[in-house]
Swiss-Prot record:
UniProt name for this protein: ATP synthase epsilon chain
Role noted for this protein: Produces ATP from ADP in the presence of a proton gradient across the membrane.
Matches recorded under InterPro entries: ATP_F1_dsu/esu_C_sf (IPR036794), ATP_synth_F1_dsu/esu (IPR001469), ATP_synth_F1_dsu/esu_N (IPR020546), ATP_synth_F1_esu_C (IPR020547), ATPsynth_dsu/esu_N (IPR036771)
Subunit architecture: F-type ATPases have 2 components, CF(1) - the catalytic core - and CF(0) - the membrane proton channel. CF(1) has five subunits: alpha(3), beta(3), gamma(1), delta(1), epsilon(1). CF(0) has three main subunits: a, b and c.
Similarity-based family: Belongs to the ATPase epsilon chain family.
Membrane topology listed for this record: Peripheral membrane protein
Subcellular location: Cell inner membrane
Amino acid sequence: MATIKVDVVSAEEQIFSGQAKFVALPGEAGELGILPGHTPLITRIRPGAVRIESENGEEEFVFVAGGILEVQPGAVTVLADTAIRGKDLDEAKAEQARKRAEEALQNTGSNLEYATAQAELAYATAQLAAIQRLRKLRGQH
């Protein structure tokens, strides 16, 4: 079966590098699904889960906090602002971050503080959604 080279990197480290049959991720205009031979594309990505289906059918999940996606016919590169392997996501920390961001929204004094709190809330909410999605796919409740 045809595969595509996938690299997911953040400013800190390379998170994933390998061959895949399929990649799904949250693009700026909606969910994107990428197969080998996909039309070249460059777009921004939103915070959320990147799902990588490997050659042997196993799935790898990576949470990204936004970034840039580059697609070439034989390669997919995700340049993430921040990336966390699915197995390393911490639901308790994400929930605390969501609560802090909601509190900050209530207590903002300037437009900049409000925008920062909104971005933090979107990040925490996307991380919690990725955790729930991963748990559902693994059959955990």
